[in-house]
A protein has these predicted regions:
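Sec/Tat signal peptide C-region and signal peptidase I cleavage site
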Residues: 22-27
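A bilobed periplasmic-binding-protein/Venus flytrap-type ligand-binding module shared by bacterial periplasmic
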Residues: 46-47, 110-119, 208-223, 271
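Pocket-lining segment of extracytoplasmic ligand-binding domains
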Residues: 87, 159-160, 165-254
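Short, glycine-/small- and polar/acidic-enriched structural segments
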Residues: 28-161, 167-170, 177-183, 195-199, ...
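Bacterial N-terminal signal peptides
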Residues: 11-21
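Secondary-structure end/capping motifs
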Residues: 220-298
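Conserved C-terminal helix/tail region of periplasmic/extracytoplasmic solute-binding proteins
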Residues: 291-326
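Bacterial N-terminal signal peptides that target proteins for export
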Residues: 2-12
C-alpha cells in the first residue's frame, strides 16, 4: 500500500513547507502543493477553514511551489496531491505516471486585448506579436485554442514570452500588438483604451487548476483520494454559495484589498466547472494542442491522463445528501 505518511523531502530553497493545523494530531497527514493560495484555490482554502478536511480524518501540509517543482515532487512519490493540474498534464503527456482526478476551473479568465486601433479582429493579428507570460502557460494555451476554434493557423502568429513585470510596458509602448490579459490586468490597462478582441472565458475550455495525483497513489489508495476530493468538493460548494465568508477565508492566506479579492472571486466563479470535471471533447482539444506545443508525437488517450470517476461519485453523493451551511 502507498504510505500516506510519506517522508518529508528536502525541498528546493524556493519552496516553503508548512503545516496547516486542522485541529487534530490524530489525523492522517497529506501534503498538497499550491503555487499560491489565492481565490483560484478557494475550494481548498474553504475545505481547510471549514473543517471539511478534518472531517475526513486528514491534516493538510501545504507545500508552496510552482507547477514544475510540484510535478517533479509528485512523480517522486513525496507529494500526495498537486493543484497544478495543467503542469501535471504536460508531464503525463511525456509519459509521467500521474493522473488528473479533478478539474476545478476550465474557462480561462483571459481577454485577448490589443491597443492598436488597426487591429479589430483575430484575423488582423496574423503575423503580429502577442505577448505571453511563459510558453505553455494558461494564457498561451487559451490563445492557441481560440485561434484553432476559428480555423486560424497558430504558426501564423508570433508569440513572445515577456515576464509579468515587463508585459505592461511592452503592451503600453506598442512593442507588442496584443496580449491575453486577466480582468485584474484589464482594470490597470483600462485608461489606455485597450480593446478586447475575444473573451476566452466564453470561447474555450481547458484543464486549468484542479488536482493531480500519482498513478501509484490512485491505484493503491483510492480511498485516500476520495476522502480528499470529498473535502475539496464541499469547500467548493460552500465557496460558490457564500461569497463574503469565502473572501474572508482567502484573505487569511493572501492579504489583499477587499475590492481586489471580490473581483478575483467573481472571476474564478465564472471559470468553474459544474461538478469538477470536463467533457471528452474538451480533453481531446487540450491534449492535441498541448501535445503540439511540447512536441509530443504520439498522444495518449484521455483515459490514460484523466480519471474523473471518483469526483463524479463524490458529487453524486453530495447532491443527494449534503448542503453547505454557514
Amino acid at each position: 500500500m502507498y504510505n500516506a505518511s510519506i517522508k518529508k523531502p528536502v525541498w528546493l530553497a524556493a519552496v516553503l513547507y508548512l503545516s496547516v493545523l486542522t485541529g487534530s494530531a490524530l489525523g492522517e497527514d497529506v501534503t498538497v502543493s499550491y503555487a499560491a493560495l489565492t481565490a483560484a484555490y478557494m475550494d481548498h482554502i474553504v475545505a481547510i477553514e471549514k473543517g471539511y478536511i478534518l472531517e475526513e480524518g486528514l491534516n493538510v501540509k501545504i507545500m508552496r511551489a510552482g507547477g514544475g517543482t510540484a510535478t517533479q515532487t509528485l512523480l517522486s512519490g513525496q507529494l500526495h496531491f498537486s493543484s497544478s493540474a495543467g503542469t501535471a498534464l504536460s508531464a503525463a503527456l511525456r509519459g509521467g505516471l500521474v493522473k488528473i482526478v479533478y478539474t476545478n476551473m476550465s474557462r480561462p479568465t483571459y481577454r485577448l486585448v490589443s491597443n492598436k486601433p488597426e487591429i479589430k479582429t483575430l484575423q488582423d493579428l496574423v503575423g503580429k506579436k502577442i505577448a505571453i507570460n511563459t510558453f505553455g502557460d494558461t494564457g498561451h494555451l487559451a490563445t492557441l485554442l481560440l485561434f484553432k476554434k476559428y480555423g486560424l493557423d497558430t504558426k501564423s502568429f508570433l508569440f513572445i514570452a515577456v515576464r509579468n513585470e515587463a508585459r505592461f510596458p511592452a503592451f503600453v509602448s506598442g512593442s507588442v500588438d496584443a496580449a491575453p490579459l486577466s480582468p485584474r490586468d484589464i482594470a490597470q490597462v483600462g485608461p489606455l483604451k485597450g480593446h478586447i478582441l475575444a473573451d476566452t472565458t466564453k470561447e474555450v475550455q481547458l484543464v486549468w487548476n484542479g488536482v493531480a495525483v500519482s498513478s501509484k497513489l490512485l491505484a493503491e489508495n483510492p480511498l485516500l483520494v476520495e476522502r480528499f476530493l470529498r473535502a475539496v468538493a464541499k469547500g467548493r460548494e460552500f465557496a460558490r454559495r457564500y461569497k463574503e465568508p469565502t473572501i474572508a477565508m482567502i484573505a487569511k492566506y493572501t492579504p489583499t484589498p477587499s475590492d481586489v479579492l471580490s473581483l478575483d472571486y467573481d472571476t474564478v466563479l465564472g471559470s468553474m466547472t459544474e461538478s469538477g470535471w470536463v467533457t471528452d471533447d474538451v480533453l481531446r482539444d487540450e491534449i492535441m494542442t498541448r501535445g503540439e506545443l511540447i512536441k509530443v508525437t504520439k498522444l495518449p488517450e484521455a483515459g490514460q491522463l484523466f480519471d474523473y470517476r471518483i469526483i463524479k461519485k463524490v458529487y453524486a453523493e453530495l447532491k443527494k445528501s449534503w448542503k453547505p451551511k454557514l
